[in-house]
């Protein structure tokens, strides 16, 4: 598949994963869906230099109850949310209910003095 949607972090990394240019952390992810997704888990997956793909197990997750459709919800990350320059990362989205069309914005905070 050449889309940005996948149920796995394996393969297709040129479409769904990216390399962070600086040390930093995941501050938050804002998600909006056309459906009431119910209890939803968003996770940060990462791997360091020398590993092709982000880890299939999230290093940290946040759960939010997305009870209303067409409404933005904030997933606020506070621990185990750091990454290092050159890491490959991915964000996972795991809703209880079918999400259908969903949009998300990821807010990363970089330390510009610690780059690749």
What are these regions (language model features)?
Residues 79-97:
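Noncatalytic modules at the cell exterior or secretory-pathway interfaces
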Residues 32-85:
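Terminal beta-strand-rich extracellular "head" domains
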Residues 8-11, 66-70, 86, 103:
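Short linear sequence motifs
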Residues 12-15, 70-74, 80, 90, ...:
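Generic intrinsically disordered, low-complexity segments enriched for polar/acidic and small residues
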Residues 1-48, 93-116:
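Beta-sheet-rich sandwich/jelly-roll-like modules and their strand-loop junctions
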């Amino acid at each position: 598949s050449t889309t940005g949607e996948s149920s796995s972090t394996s393969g297709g990394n040129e479409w769904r994963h990216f390399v962070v240019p600086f040390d930093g952390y995941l501050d938050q992810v804002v998600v909006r869906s056309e459906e009431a997704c119910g209890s939803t888990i968003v996770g940060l997956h990462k791997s360091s230099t020398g590993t092709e793909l982000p880890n299939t197990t999230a290093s940290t997750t946040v759960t939010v109850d997305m009870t209303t459709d067409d409404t933005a919800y904030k997933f606020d990350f506070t621990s185990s949310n750091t990454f290092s320059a050159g890491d490959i990362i991915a964000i996972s989205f795991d809703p209880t209910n079918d999400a259908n069309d969903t949009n998300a914005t990821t807010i990363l905070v970089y330390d510009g003095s610690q780059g690749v």
